[in-house]
Structure formats: structure tokens, C-alpha cells
Amino acid sequence: MQSRIALVDRATPAEQIRILAYIFEIDQTGGLLLRHLVEAARRGVPVRLLIDGIGPEPHYPFEDELIVALHEVAPGIELRIFHPRSDLVEISHRMHDKLFLVGDTAVIGSTSIWDASFRNWLSERDLMVSGDAGEEASSLHAMYQHFALFWNSPEVVRPEPEKFLKVASPYRDSQGYATLDPARIHYWREWLLAPLDAEAHATDPAAADTPPASDPLDDPAAAPAPGASFDPAWMPIACERLHYVHDWPDKRSPGTLQDMLQAFDTAQHEIVIINPYLILVPELREALERKQREGVHVILVSASLASITQEFPAVGRAYADDLPGLVNAGIEVREYSDRDNRMMHAKLVLIDGHRYYLGSFNFDSLSARLNTENGLWIDIPKDGLDPLQDSVAYFLRNSSSVSDANGRLLADPDARCRAAGCGGAWRWVTMLIRRFL
């Protein structure tokens, strides 16, 4: 978060701030960033914020009183919501993209704007990219085009806070609210305009780039020391070696799934996939098993069964059900764990030791079929500086294989599920809802 806030604070009126967010919670993390965005907008920086309309739970991202207060104190912030639902029944089509653009710099990766990503609960990976957004061949230009495509799509709606005080709010109907609370609007207005205490938030864990690891020297993404200056270590990479990918708002083909399959086809020696959710759709599983048969070493690093099950037992059950088949196909499956008991949430792919993907794509049916995703492919030249090799090494080092040297599972998946909490009825429930996992 420190890097994002520094970019926002340095932004000038000649630049733009554009944010795609799957989750933007008004907790300590999101609240801190929002107040910095308000300051930027009040000094003339144009800010556009597009948030998925559902989030991790069935609710809209900002309460109406906050939207009204934002409109009053910082009209330069434009807020739109992706695909909100009035009945909250159909919630399968989600904007899972994560993109943070300020001028000629972007932050891309797995991280959402909430405490879970910045307070030592999830292990994330992001990358900062700088270039010429005005150059059509640049990845920065492609990122801005992606944002504009979503911002102007039919799947997006614009709240109209100037009307909220006169009519019932369409964003609160499902919660049974008919009018807004003037006292609540006043609270949010005062909160948004309260002075930011630089010293206070410099030592706040939410202000750090990533959760502090138990061993900062071990984790390449460990947070800098409190109060450290923002000075990224840039690694020059030729424009043609960066390829930005994303889905269309309506999730049409070809999209990120097809891009991933094409990348796997090029693998000659090794594919490493680091992803919290390994519930492979048939196309992905077939591609990986085929590459394994062709002599390509396929390594899958997952979040632990216990952490997946804690989030949603059906997901843990589906993963456990797939383990025997993956291991029998010769694929090396590993599970991440660290001393802080964080859930791995990073999304990385490494092909043949030099071609990386970093982004939002999960290896499950939601990312493959339903959710919109984005990411950056990076082709590292021979003997070139590599910004992600330490991250891949970290996740491999902090994971253990689920099978022995002879390719046999070390523990029975059913027994592991019973211990983790995804046994019993979850076997049958998972069979019914698997295509939505």
C-alpha cells in the first residue's frame, strides 16, 4: 500500500488515476487509500474508480451516504460499479481484475484493497510497471485501453449521488433502506476531510506494500521498514517483452483462458503454477497432463487444503477430489505454508525459467468461464534482470509436496478433508455446485 499511496500523493493534475478493484473495502486499508485519493482529487488530479458491484459478500462496495459525501467533498472522483444486481441472485459474472494506474506507472497483481491483503492474512504478489502510456505498443497504453473499455461498457453503472437526497436509493433496496441518513453523510464528510497524519499511517501495517513476513529476509515481498522512503528498484525490460492481457467485460472468447492455454503449448522444459485455487477446468487439466506426458516438468503450488477449506469448504473438497488424478498423471503438486499461517493468494506462472505471468487469474472455473481477469506476461532475456525469480523461489521453498518420491499421495484426501472440515456432506454438495467453484 505504501507504493500506491506514494504514487497517489505524487500525482499531478496533468496525470490520471485509474483503478479497477475487485474488492475495495472501507476498512483501515481501503479507508487510508480513499482519503489519499480525496486529497489528490481536491488538488485537481482526475480520479476514476471502478469497483466490482458485489465483492466477496452480497453487498455493494460503498454505502450511499459515503458516495454522497465523496461527491460533495471531492467531485473530481468519479465512481462506477461493475454489474450491480438488484436482486442479488445472479452473482456469477464478476470483475476480478486488479489494476492501479497513476500517470505512467501501474501496479498489477493479486492484491485487492482491503485489510486481508495488507495485514498479514494473505500472501500476495504485485509488480510495479513504468513506461510511456502514450506509446501504443506499450503495456501501459494497453492497461489504459483496458480501463476505458470497462469504464464505458454496458455492464457498468454510475451512481447518481446528486439525486440520492431526493429519492430512495436503488443501491439500498435489497437491504430494506428507503432514505439516506443525513447524520451519516455528515460523519463521512468529516472523515474524508480530516487531516492525514503522516507519522501515524507510516507505522500502520496497512500502509505497507505487503504483509510483514515472519522472516523479512526470506520473503522477497516483505514490507519495508516503517517510514522508509518510496524508491522502487526499477529493472529495465524492453517494451516488446511485456504483453498485457485481459478479458472483455462480457467474458467473450478468446480471453485469458485461451491466452494461458497458448502459453502452455510453448513450454519445452518446465511449467510452474503458483495459485491458491487449483480446480482445473478440462481444457487446463488436459493441457498440463499432455505437457507432462511430453516430458515437461509441471509443478503446481497451491494454498494449503486447510486454508482453502477455511475460506469455503466446497472449494477444499473439489481440490482434494482432484489430487489423486493430478498426482497419478505425474504432476508435482505442492502446498504452501508459512510460520504466520497466511493463505497464499499470489497468482504466478513461470514457463521454461524465463516467461512469467502475474495477475488475477485463478486456476478454477470462475476465472476460466465467468469472471473477467487481467495480467502481465514478461519474457526475461537471457542474463537479464529478473524481478520475479525470488518470488517463485520463495513459494517453492515454503511449500511441500503432497506425494512421495514414488508419486504416491502422502495422505488420503478424504482423511485430510475430514480433518480440515470439508468431509462428510461436502462431498455431495461439491458435486452439485462444482461448476460454480
Question: Model features per residue range: what roles?
Answer:
Residues 1-15, 23-266, 306-354, 361, ...:
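HKD-type phospholipase D/PLD-like phosphodiesterase module
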Residues 18, 148-151, 272, 393:
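Structural signal for well-ordered, non-membrane alpha-helices
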Residues 18, 48-50, 80, 272, ...:
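A structural signal for isolated positions on well-ordered beta-strands in alpha/beta enzyme cores
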Residues 19, 153-160, 273, 401-405:
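Intrinsically disordered or highly flexible coil/loop and linker segments, enriched in small
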Residues 139, 280, 384:
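Short phosphate-engaging motifs
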Residues 259, 263-293, 297-314:
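Long, K/E/R/D-enriched contiguous segments that form extended
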Residues 268-271, 292-295, 327-333, 352-353, ...:
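Alpha-helix capping/termination and helix-coil
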Residues 335-437:
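Long, C-terminal catalytic modules of enzymes
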